[in-house]
C-alpha cells in the first residue's frame, strides 16, 4: 500500500527550514512531490532519513516538481558505484527529514512523500 505523508515548509527570515514527515515509516520511497508555493525558485532541498541519514534526494528545483529517487548500487568487487543500474531507496522505522536553504524570507511550500509500505 502506498502511504502519502506531507508537511508544510515555512522558511525563517534567512530562507532556511527543517521539517519532518511524520510519523515514522518503513518502506520504499516511491516518489517525492515538491510544491513550491511561495518559496523562491531554486530553493535547495536535501532530503534524508532522519535516523540513518540515508540520502533520498538533493535538488534545487525552479518550480513545483515530482521526483522518483533511486540510488546507484555498489559493485561487490571494489565498492564503486555502478553507473548503469539503479536500486530503490528504503527507510526503516524513521521519519523523512527535509532541510531547506535559500527558500526566501518567511515563505511557504509543501513536501509530500509516497512510501510503498508493502515491501516487507
Please place each PLM-identified region on the residue numbering.
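Surface-exposed, low-hydrophobicity beta-strand/loop segments enriched in small/polar/acidic residues
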Residues: 1-120
